Amino acid sequence: MYEFKITKLATGEESIIFGYDMTNAFRRAKLNPAEWVVWDREYID
């Protein structure tokens, strides 16, 4: 599983989401990927 550090384009809000890939992480967090920038990805067990 991966940890993705993301920032919302409109507000600068930072968040962390988790998933098996980027699509899965956004789906699990119920976020629109078009509104966010992923700036770091780290593999976690």
PLM regions and their residue ranges:
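Short aromatic-glycine-(Arg/Gly/Cys) micro-motifs in beta-strand/loop hairpins
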Residues: M1-E13
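A short, exposed loop/beta-hairpin motif centered on an aromatic-Gly-Thr core
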Residues: T11-D21
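Short, mixed-charge low-complexity intrinsically disordered segments
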Residues: K30-D45
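Amphipathic alpha-helical interaction segments
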Residues: A10-G12, R28, I44
